[in-house]
């Protein structure tokens, strides 16, 4: 599946491959000491957010690609 922004598709594939490899080779074997794909995800997320803005896709009120606030901030609990 391609990304919302054509310029983001290669980043999406790179992140998907990294995540799937980490999930299968590390996480499922109990090695949970970090996700080596974090920076790839951030770059991909930024690209998608820019593509959405450039295409004027309305996303007001929609949380996507990771929360921007911690759970305690967003639900009002402490």
UniProtKB/Swiss-Prot annotation:
Residues 5-55 form the CHCH domain. InterPro entries: MDM35_apoptosis. A motif (Cx9C motif 2) lies at residues 37-47. It catalyses: a 1,2-diacyl-sn-glycero-3-phosphate(in) = a 1,2-diacyl-sn-glycero-3-phosphate(out). One of its GO terms (cellular component) is mitochondrial intermembrane space. The record marks 27, 41 as: Important for interaction with prelid3a. A motif (Cx9C motif 1) lies at residues 8-18. Expressed in the developing pronephros. One of its GO terms (biological process) is phospholipid transport. Monomer. Forms a complex with prelid1 in the mitochondrion intermembrane space. Interacts with prelid3a. Residues 1-52 form a coiled coil. This is TP53-regulated inhibitor of apoptosis 1. The keyword Transport applies. The keyword Transport applies. It comes from Xenopus tropicalis. PROSITE patterns: CHCH (PS51808). Belongs to the TRIAP1/MDM35 family. Keywords: Apoptosis, Coiled coil, Developmental protein, Disulfide bond, Lipid transport, Mitochondrion, Transport. Involved in the modulation of the mitochondrial apoptotic pathway by ensuring the accumulation of cardiolipin (CL) in mitochondrial membranes. The triap1:prelid1 complex probably functions as a phosphatidic acid (PA) transporter across the mitochondrion intermembrane space to provide PA for cardiolipin CL synthesis in the inner membrane. Likewise, the triap1:prelid3a complex mediates the transfer of phosphatidic acid (PA) between liposomes (in vitro) and probably functions as a PA transporter across the mitochondrion intermembrane space (in vivo). It is found in: Mitochondrion; Mitochondrion intermembrane space. The gene is triap1. Disulfide bonds join 8-47, 18-37.
